[in-house]
């Protein structure tokens, strides 16, 4: 995990000095299939969690799409210098539904952390048309378009909330798997937890990895964590014994401005609500953590409202919210040298709450790429 002092944080776009060595640092060797660079597209890109994870594995971004204007600001501030072609060629799009499919170049891996939406239950066909009107339908359209043109993506790499597995009584996930199967892909999925990938956050997400059926070695084995020496872990016994241990203190700043400390009024409100929930017999209410806590609860996009899901203990003071830098670290962003916050605290909390945990995606991506390269070597 990358930890820097607070004074290394820059709330502004990257300078030439900062970006001079970025290519070497985060993408030392561009991976290739044959004589062509390995490529991906970044849909529902947010602030670039997938982009950092893929680029650190030596994969080149060919196209990205994000509609939120503040997320676009953060994405552009962090990638314009290191991926100039993406912006110079107009390949950083807004609303993906407004994009002409011909404007999306061929690519090897499709990455998308897409919103969870219900599909039509009409007829329960679980086919391509059942997804019409949803954002997943657009993903399916892009895949189908490239397949029809003779450029089938090699891998589809998707992320969603854990609840997708049971959303609409399992119908939503069934439809996604059925559509990918219809498009020529063998599907694997698994719920993974960021706390097992070196991030001190209890954050469960479902990942879907799909390979072309004609690939003879298309079964994908998910890493379920990383060990202390940063090697992927694939079974539960190793996860229990070898997983990289984390603590919340790893991501905390030494000095945080007073404005992040809860006001007396807000803190008393939290205490009242927690007591009320306790009397009702449930565990709702604010969650308090300290430097020795192994991990926090899940940071969400609503964290900016009152911070109640993750509060940090302070000696002799009321608890405080996370600083935006800490929120970035909690998601594994390389804050400081390689990542910069260019929006308000409110927007930053939303952005990090909506993002993927970078080390988790990084580890899965590494396994995907290793298998792709191995398969290519045996062709």
What label would you give each PLM region?
Residues 3, 262-379:
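C-terminal target-recognition/interaction regions appended to catalytic cores
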Residues 78, 224, 313-317:
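Short Gly/aromatic-enriched secondary-structure transition segments
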Residues 7-9, 15-153, 162-167, 171-174, ...:
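Core alpha/beta nucleotide-donor-binding catalytic domains of modification enzymes
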Residues 99-107, 119-298, 302:
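Class I S-adenosyl-L-methionine
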Residues 113, 155, 321-324:
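Short aromatic/basic micro-patch
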Residues 1-2, 10:
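Short, positively charged and aromatic/hydrophobic N-terminal segments
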């Amino acid at each position: 995990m990358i930890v820097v002092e607070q004074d290394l944080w820059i709330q502004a776009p990257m300078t030439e000095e900062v970006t001079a060595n970025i290519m070497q640092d985060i993408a030392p060797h561009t991976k290739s299939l044959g004589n062509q660079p390995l490529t991906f597209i970044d849909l529902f890109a947010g602030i670039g969690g997938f982009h950092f994870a893929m680029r650190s594995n030596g994969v080149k971004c060919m196209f990205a799409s994000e509609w939120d204007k503040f997320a676009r600001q953060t994405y552009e501030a962090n990638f314009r210098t290191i991926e100039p072609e993406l912006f110079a060629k107009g390949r950083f799009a807004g609303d993906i539904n407004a994009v002409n499919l011909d404007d999306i170049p061929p690519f090897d891996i499709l990455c998308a952390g897409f919103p969870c939406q219900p599909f039509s239950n009409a007829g329960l066909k679980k086919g391509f048309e059942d997804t019409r009107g949803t954002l997943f339908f657009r993903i399916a359209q892009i895949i189908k378009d490239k397949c029809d043109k003779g450029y089938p993506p090699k891998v589809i790499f998707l992320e969603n909330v854990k609840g997708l597995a049971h959303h609409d009584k399992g119908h939503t996930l069934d439809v996604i798997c059925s559509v990918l199967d219809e498009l020529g892909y063998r599907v694997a999925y698994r719920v993974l937890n960021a706390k097992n990938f070196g991030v001190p956050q209890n954050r469960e997400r479902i990942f879907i990895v799909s390979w072309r059926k004609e690939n003879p070695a298309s079964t994908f084995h998910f890493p379920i964590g990383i060990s202390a020496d940063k090697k992927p872990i694939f079974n539960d016994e190793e996860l229990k014994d070898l997983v990289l241990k984390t603590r919340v203190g790893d991501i905390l700043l030494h000095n945080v401005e007073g404005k992040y400390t809860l006001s007396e009024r807000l803190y008393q409100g939290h205490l009242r609500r927690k007591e009320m929930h306790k009397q009702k017999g449930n565990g709702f209410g604010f969650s308090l953590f300290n430097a020795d806590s192994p991990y926090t609860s899940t940071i969400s996009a609503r964290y900016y409202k009152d911070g109640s899901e993750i509060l940090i203990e302070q000696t002799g003071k009321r608890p405080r919210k996370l600083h935006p830098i800490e929120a970035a670290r909690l998601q594994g962003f390389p804050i400081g040298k390689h990542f910069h916050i260019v929006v308000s605290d409110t927007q930053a909390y939303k952005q990090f709450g909506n993002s993927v945990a970078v080390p988790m995606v990084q580890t899965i991506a590494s396994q995907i790429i290793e298998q792709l390269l191995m398969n290519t070597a045996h062709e």
